[in-house]
């Protein structure tokens, strides 16, 4: 009588996370070593491993750097900002950023770009698209402390043009002197880390609200509206080269008014009476005033 061994069970093919084919700009957040990409994981030579989500982003925020159970913007805040930005309400700002960075990187055919505090990726994606349209082949890494924001960014990046990660600006998982240009859009400036990451002679573009930004919104929210403080900060290792203002007017209607409100810091510090006045409006017109602060990294 012949005996046959049972057939080996079929193994399901290993699923690979979506996203950029390489993660060459990111480094291990524990030891700083290069990361090798597997199917659903990034691993460094010291065997520190980090999950790759199905959408293609990496989770490079160690537990020791998480100062809250769920750090960063909530799912609701991210959704409100995404809806508002999709209306084109801040397109003038995005277009200005694109023109500025393209001019700063004019002489580099393959520049490296880092977006610190990228949110849901609206500005990053449009900036990379503009660089490509100008004939460049950029390498771009973008990160935010909010996993909800990064998840949206990676999911919408159908071309896998950007390396996305959940990470902190105060412990950036990027190698020293890796970025030709670093952009920070309305996020806290981690000057020491930015100086480490930007190449000597490279650029740091810091986008901040100008004095009259969203003043029309404040006139509804507050009995005594106030102008924003002018930011003109000196950062060690950088020299401020220029301040470039962007002015426009914005009219929003319906639910977009509340989406705009929800993506601002005023959402957390407005009295109920002000929020109720805003909710009663059908139309809101307000000034937009952004400033781009362009810093140059000192040469070694």
Where are these regions (language model features)?
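N-terminal auxiliary segments of SAM/dcSAM-dependent transferases
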Residues: 21-70
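Class I SAM-dependent methyltransferase Rossmann-like catalytic core
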Residues: 67, 72-96
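Class I SAM-dependent methyltransferase SAM/SAH-binding core
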Residues: 112-115, 120-171
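A short acidic, Gly/Pro-enriched loop at the edge of an enzyme's catalytic core
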Residues: 170-181
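A short SAM/SAH-binding and catalytic strip from SAM-dependent methyltransferases
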Residues: 179-193, 208
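A short glycine-rich, Lys/Arg-flanked "PGG" loop and its adjoining helix->strand segment in the class I
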Residues: 191-203
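Conserved beta-strand signature within the Rossmann-like core of class I S-adenosyl-L-methionine
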Residues: 201-211
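Conserved Class I S-adenosyl-L-methionine
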Residues: 246-300
């Amino acid at each position: 009588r012949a005996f046959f061994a049972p057939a080996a069970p079929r193994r399901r093919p290993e699923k690979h996370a979506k996203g950029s084919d390489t993660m060459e700009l990111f480094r291990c957040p524990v030891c700083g070593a290069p990361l090798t990409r597997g199917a659903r994981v990034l691993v460094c030579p010291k065997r520190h491993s980090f999950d790759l989500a199905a959408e293609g982003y990496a989770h490079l925020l160690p537990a020791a750097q998480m100062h809250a159970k769920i750090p960063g913007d909530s799912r609701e805040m991210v959704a409100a900002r995404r809806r508002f930005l999709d209306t084109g309400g801040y397109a003038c700002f995005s277009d200005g950023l694109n023109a500025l960075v393209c001019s700063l990187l004019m002489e580099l055919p393959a520049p490296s770009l880092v977006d610190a505090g990228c949110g849901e990726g609206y500005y990053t994606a449009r900036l990379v698209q503009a660089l490509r349209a100008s004939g460049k082949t950029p390498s771009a890494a973008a990160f935010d402390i909010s996993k909800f924001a990064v998840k949206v960014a990676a999911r919408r990046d159908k071309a896998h043009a950007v390396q996305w990660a959940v990470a902190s600006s105060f412990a950036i998982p990027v190698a020293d002197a890796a970025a030709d240009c670093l952009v920070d859009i309305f996020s806290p400036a981690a000057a020491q880390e930015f100086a480490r990451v930007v190449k000597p002679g490279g650029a740091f573009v810091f986008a901040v609200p100008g004095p009259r930004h969203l003043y029309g919104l404040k006139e509804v929210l507050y009995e005594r509206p106030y102008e924003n403080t002018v930011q003109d900060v000196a950062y060690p290792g950088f020299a401020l080269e220029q301040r470039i203002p962007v002015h426009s007017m914005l009219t929003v209607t319906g639910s977009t008014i509340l989406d705009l409100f929800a993506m601002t810091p005023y959402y957390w510090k407005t009295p109920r009476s002000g929020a109720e006045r805003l909710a009663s409006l059908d139309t809101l017109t307000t000034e937009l005033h952004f400033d781009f602060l362009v810093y140059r990294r000192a040469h070694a």
